[in-house]
A protein has these predicted regions:
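Single, function-defining residue in the core of a domain
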Residues: 1, 28-31, 38-42, 57-61, ...
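DNA-recognition alpha helix
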Residues: 1-15
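Short hydrophobic/aromatic segments of transmembrane alpha-helices and their interfaces
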Residues: 7, 53, 233-234
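Short secondary-structure boundary/capping segments within folded domains
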Residues: 14-16, 53-54, 91
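Major-groove recognition helix of helix-turn-helix-like DNA-binding domains
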Residues: 14-31
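A short, well-structured juxtamembrane/interface segment
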Residues: 45-52
Length: 325
């Protein structure tokens, strides 16, 4: 809209300056990925205001951590750097890059991210990313593939509250049953054979039954919120399913932002990483505009359509390009 207002400077005659594909490619190569990574580190942040609907639970900012993979161009250098995922027959058609993201559930804003080859584990990536990005006002949710004593301990040390699903075979003997049906237990490092350096957790077991079938899904959550009055088990069980907001975020920048393209176009690992940081920054910019629009109307940003916002921005882009630099 700002650019539309400036069109009078050129008498409405400004023409878009078209750069060739070769010029863009050369400029991207000169820029490299590190600048984009540093820019993301400075720009990506939580954006929910204290009164934002759907973004908070009892004073804690709702966050989720998860990972996803993206196909990259099937070039030899990309294949060597990123690697292929396993397939039932042979190997996948494309190498894949792994992206780990810390997301603010209420606004769908990616507040921190990490990019690595396919073979890197999400747990190792989280251990490197989370300690510096978590804060004491956060309640962070994660699925059962993330739990490990060392990562749990690192995340707890940040001061953040955690609500993580764990696998059903994790030994969590009850030590004290609480009034809300949850119970206290202690987790240990698998290397701690003497079991002297454990960490107390609160365990919440529950099942979800599909009304259409007799099948029940069992869930086991652990949290470092030990006081049931501060966060009752029933509320935490319901809250955990807000973690699925992060799946929508991955769908937004993997599918909607890239239209029909399912494979990143960059031909080298450096440019793949640069492209991914660019996508993350563009996604943040869109989500920030949506948050501002929702806040003015007192709405939950979930009420707004990401696809519609993206279309509006795309319609404005040619007008912005019409203003010479």
């Amino acid at each position: 809209m700002v650019c539309e207002g400036l069109q009078w400077l050129s008498g409405g005659q400004a023409g878009a300056l078209q750069a060739s594909k070769s010029a863009i490619s050369q400029a991207r190569s000169r820029l490299g990925p590190e600048v984009m990574k540093q820019l993301a580190a400075r720009v990506l942040r939580p954006m929910a205001r204290p009164d934002a609907p759907g973004a908070w639970y009892r004073g804690w900012r709702l966050m989720a951590v998860d990972g996803s993979c993206m196909d990259v161009a099937d070039e030899a250098v990309n294949a060597e750097h990123f690697g292929y995922p396993a397939a039932s027959r042979g190997q996948s058609a494309f190498p894949q890059a792994r992206v780990l993201a810390l997301v603010e559930c209420g606004t769908h804003a990616v507040v921190a991210a990490s990019i690595a080859p396919y073979g890197h584990s999400e747990v190792a990536m989280a251990a490197e990313l989370l300690p510096a990005k978590l804060a004491g006002d956060m309640l962070v949710m994660a699925d059962r593939n993330f739990y490990g004593f060392k990562l749990w301990q690192k995340a707890c040390a940040s001061g953040a509250k955690l609500l993580w699903r764990v696998k059903s075979n994790l030994g969590l003997p009850g030590q004290h049953e609480l009034a809300d049906g949850s119970y206290l237990s202690t987790v240990y490092d698998s290397d701690d054979r003497t079991r002297r350096s454990g960490q107390q957790v609160r365990v919440i077991d529950y099942t979800l039954k599909d009304s259409a079938t007799p099948v029940q899904d069992s869930y086991r959550l652990v949290t470092n919120i030990l006081d049931p009055e501060a966060a009752p088990a029933l509320e935490l069980a319901a809250l955990y399913h807000e973690r699925w907001e992060i799946e929508s975020v991955f769908d937004e920048f993997k599918t909607h932002m890239r239209s029909a393209s399912t494979v990143l176009r960059s031909k080298t690992p450096e440019l793949v990483e640069q492209e991914l940081w660019g996508l993350l920054l563009a996604h943040f910019a869109i989500r920030q505009l949506m948050e501002q629009a929702a806040w003015r109307q007192g709405l939950d940003p979930d009420r707004l359509s990401f696809v519609h916002a993206l279309r509006v921005i795309k319609r404005k882009m040619p007008q912005a390009a019409a203003i010479p630099p």
